[in-house]
Amino acid sequence: MEGSARAPGRVAVTTAGLRGAQWDRSALPPDVRISIETLRTHDGAAVTGFLMARGGERNVVCAMHPREMNPAHYLAPAVLAAGSAFWVQGSRTPNVDLRLEHETALLDMAAGQAFLRALGFRTTVLMGTSGGGPLAAFYCQQSARRPQERIEHTPAGRPVKLASADLPAPDGVILVSSHLGQGPLLQSCLDPSVADEKDPFKIVDALHPFLPANGFRPPPESSVYSADFVGRYR
């Protein structure tokens, strides 16, 4: 939602998340080689990654999402064409939201970073798309801390071995269509215009985001909401 005035003819434009673009194998350089690697994390879990390289690269871009395993990442061809290798990996619990713990996913990412450093890559850059963005930021925060200052337990109380783990620090971060984290994302999905949880059709018009009077415009126009409406809605 925006609080600024709507410009004439303004059209909504979004960037592509993991599900907003298509994989095009024909766009890969013809000399690319793809290897599949299974790694062990510091706490003994197994994770899988895909390394795409043409040979001789000193830099590698690393894509990881906490929930999705996406070896067919739509940005791989562009990264390879620019002269860097491309690494994409999953967590220990791909595609299973109920078992995902971001704290242990940091150990999964660390296994990938250690593997790439051992291969001799001089520079590693994390690329976080959608939910991969806050995961990359979380990893950078924990890797920059002294071991004794790292998180010791998940929110549910499960011990996590970040203090004794090697968390190789990346040299950079790229955020693509990133959100602020799973908690803020889910919280923003709550609809305050629903007056009664037992009756989802009972709506408070003053908070209804799809009423033209509140700023809604049908596509392809962009909806624009006043700062007052956004404040009350949030």
Residue ranges and their predicted role:
Residues 92-125:
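Catalytic nucleophile-loop/oxyanion-hole region of alpha/beta-hydrolase
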Residues 76-100:
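Conserved alpha/beta-hydrolase
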Residues 127-137:
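Gly/Ala-rich beta-loop-alpha elbow adjacent to hydrolase catalytic centers
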Residues 159-234:
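Alpha/beta-hydrolase-fold enzymes
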Residues 138-171:
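Conserved hydrolase catalytic core segment
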Residues 3-59:
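N-terminal cap/lid segment of alpha/beta-hydrolase-fold proteins
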Residues 55-58, 63-70:
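Active-site glycine-rich loops that stabilize anionic/oxyanionic intermediates
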Residues 61-63, 86, 173:
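Hydrophobic beta-strand anchors of alpha/beta hydrolase catalytic cores
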